[in-house]
Amino acid sequence: MHRFLVRRPDAVILLLAGYFLVEFLVRLAMPHGLRYDESQQALFSQWLTFGYDSQPPLYNWVQSIVVSVFGLSLAAISSVKNLFLFLVYISYYRLAREVLTDKVFAAIATLSLLTIPQFFWEAQRDLTHTVAQLVTINLFLCGVIRTLKAPSLGSYIFTGVALGLGMLSKYNFALLVAGAFVAVLMHPQGRARVFDKRFLLTIAISVLIFLPHGLWLMHNLGLASGRTLGIMEQNAPDGAFAKFVKGPLKFLRLILVISAPTLVVYALVFGKSLFRNFGRSNEWTRFFEILLAVIAILVLILIVTIGMTDMRDRWLLPFLFLLPIYLCLKMEIAGIKAADFGKRFFYVPLVMMVVIPVLLLVRTFFPSLFGAFDHYNTPYPAFVQQIVAAEGKKPGLVLTDGWLPAGNLHLQLPDVPAMSLFFPNLTTDYAWNASRPILIVWRPGKDNGVMPVELSNWLRDTLGPQYAAPDTKLADVQYIHGKPGEMASFAYGWVYPK
């Protein structure tokens, strides 16, 4: 296969299609417990609205449409995720082809995404909105570069559509737009493209696409920004000097953590050739250098301004994942022949395509090897089956405090509405009578199953004070693929009309 990719680089598309089909089947073979992002999508699939929480709604909309057509199932959740991941790679390959002459280098850059742990591992398990953003980044940059190279009405329209969708994927897409705008202005043909009348069409299309959510955002700014800003300011130091040091150092550390595996692989494969004539540049290396430099400056300004010290690597992934294209550009203009190194390099992603699915299966089927259970192993299916059978009826509403149990329970009871008090803005109609009681569920901690205050308050405020303290029970259910005695605890109660 590695030799075939050198001869036919476009075959990378079929290779990736097969890989994500395998990943889809692997997810179906894994336990049906959902991790946080999967659970959120299962929960949010009940609504098709202009806004949900602190993230823009693009991914949620796609997931909701799929569920409305095919119904809620693990297959519906996993198919959307793997489709988006496949689109990331395909659009990345298209972007690489826009700036690289050699198709082999484009294939190398694309498969280099399998050397970024935050992408090949975290994105496979979580990162729904980030994955959607990566697709829109690739499409947007394709539109920008195509417009710079050969402007047309179609390229301006395409760029506007990608820009609008990008702003619907994640809000920090605005950082990329700012970086791209500066990079365009610094390009030899950039100003002519910006002052072209067709650029107004690009802006108009993007505004129209974003407008419905933008109006929602104006009326829900606190909801959309509060949680993210809270995470950013978490553990922020009080002293000004510490703010100027701790945040930037964390930023630099994350850049190194994300970039290091790719750089190590490239150094091993390309050796001294990687750094030979590294000082050479062309219009596209300068474009990416300016793009990434502007983004870095803006992030540093944010860090210093709000005292952001608790950053997550997923926030930088949408920018640093462009590194392989930049490195391949540098090597191509230095005269390095991709075919000379392609056979050696392609071993790495091909091995990763085998290792990653195997690790996913091993992690969930043999949790004792890792000393802890993953969310996949939480026995929601057995818990729901047990309590519904014991009660002899299904609930009219499932109510939880957090979204992790809410989405998992909704997956097990897809015909029953579910709500999480973590998202008080997302409510739904439900039946409540003697044959359809309300089921309240939470995961008990060291409180011995005492009902969370939020649930008690909801029952009191919504149903009446007489319902604020219902009878509750504890259920211990063995973890999926756990040993006897390895139990997951659930607390629950059935609330009937009085």
Label each region the model flagged.
Residues S79-L100, F120, L139-G143:
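Transmembrane-helix motifs of polytopic, lipid-linked glycan transferases
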Residues F140-F158:
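Membrane-interface transmembrane helices that cradle and orient dolichyl/undecaprenyl
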Residues I306-D313, I336-K393, W403-M419, W442-N448, ...:
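Membrane-proximal, lumen/periplasm-facing interface regions of secretory-pathway glyco-
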